[in-house]
Amino acid sequence: MDRKVVIIPTYNEKENIEKIIRAVFALEGGYHILVIEDGSPDGTADIVKNMQKEFPESLHMIERKGKLGLGTAYITGFKWSVDNGYDYIFEMDADFSHNPNDVPRLYQACKDGADLAIGSRYCNGISVINWPIGRVIMSYYASVYVRTVLGMKVYDTTAGFKCYRRQVLETIDLDKVKMKGYGFQIEMKYSTYKLGFKIQEVPIIFVDRTEGTSKMSSGIFGEAFWGVMGLKMRKIKPRK
């Protein structure tokens, strides 16, 4: 059986973390979970530790000191997942904006030939719920901007709901990934694209969080906007 792990970064997710873990474990297929916990003061880590008694073989956690950023959380998770022999590695938010029931659809896309499957809000129009119209417009046109500048045929360039084949993460030089916020999502897709891997978008409906606090900020969008120009000029090479 394929070994599959869902990486879930957390910071102050006590309202969501137990529910999202149980939702993933309720799926058929034997998914494991790796929580990357960035020192949440609200007790998120304690909730996960208590659940590890119930799921000792399939629930893992890496605790980091302080809020170190989305990109570094996933890089840490990618390295751990590859080192521990997982075949398919997922990214997913803790707040149910990504529907756990879509996880098997991303997995199936990779089984059918994709190297990276993206849960896409924009490949079939705009499929977003509970966002203010201004944020929808900003996110959609940010993806248009990225697609235009980088020449990458991906509609949802900032999507954070993904499934990688392990070969992709073994090939990308993860130590040279520079962006830390949502620009990280762009950089990883662009690296995957430039290294010749097959990317497939799977349509999803994105529902903004109903509990907890959003981690989005203008600085995150700024990094993504300016980072794209530097990314365009950078030569992407596989890890040696």
What kind of feature is each model-predicted range?
Residues 3-5, 101, 108, 112, ...:
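Terminal low-complexity segments of carbohydrate-biosynthetic enzymes
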Residues 37-46, 96:
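A conserved acidic beta->alpha catalytic loop
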